[in-house]
Amino acid sequence: MQAGKPFIPADLTPLFHAPIYRELKESERLRYNQLHALYFNEQIMYFETALGRPILTALLRQEWPDRLADGLRQFVAEELRHTEMFRQLNRRCAPHLYGERDYRFVEVPAFWTAAMRWAVNHPLSLPLFLWLMLLQEERSLYYSKAYLRHPSPLDPAFVEAHRLHLADEAKHVRWDEELLDALWLRAHPLLRRVNAKLFAWMLEEFFGAPKRAQLRVLDELARELPELRGRLPEMRRQVLALSRDEAYRKTLYSREIVPRTFARFDECPEFRTLSLCGYQPQSTGG
């Protein structure tokens, strides 16, 4: 690790988009950047552990063409490898935060953990999770590329981790699309409408604008840098206010970030009528 280098492109962090960021010292910005990057790694780990692998394991209980079944097994193995890579990276960077646990900022209540565990084991009835996988993995492609093209030096361990992540995610996006083609279009229209509404809610609640975990990042920043404690309430307020900032929301999801997912939304009437972060329907020209 190189303690003096940022871990993530600054524009991928929410506080960068808040006015108070310009008032922080360079050292304060740097430590915030590093803490947010650790949280971002946690988010990848949680998504792959709580959603990705269980969904794929459940799908492998179904009959698939040999080529796709082999792809799904490879998908599971690669998700395991990614999780371990980001776990070890966080532990090397911040042993005081991760010495005996994997998550410092991502905290999911027991009720939601149990509900999610049940839901992801029923991907045929709840194919919304395939949309979440496609959306998040296509977004990961964009983020990993941002690490590689960043003009100023980032910590090389983080750049290398995202280079390796990028190498697999392109395949994962293709497999996600194949699964959607196989399961979504054959589902009953009512099931698709219900799943689309659940998807919109989950996206806003867990994968949208800053909420609980990002506030814990700010809390840790103020704990490590006591001179920021007086500013903590205002930092929290401004970060939460980003949920109403449409320009910021488009930095999370847009046609530049997730073009294939949004193009598929355009083709599905059940998504075109929903309010989704960063999404505005376009004509498919059919």
Which stretches of residues belong to each language-model region?
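Non-heme di-metal
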Residues: M1-G286
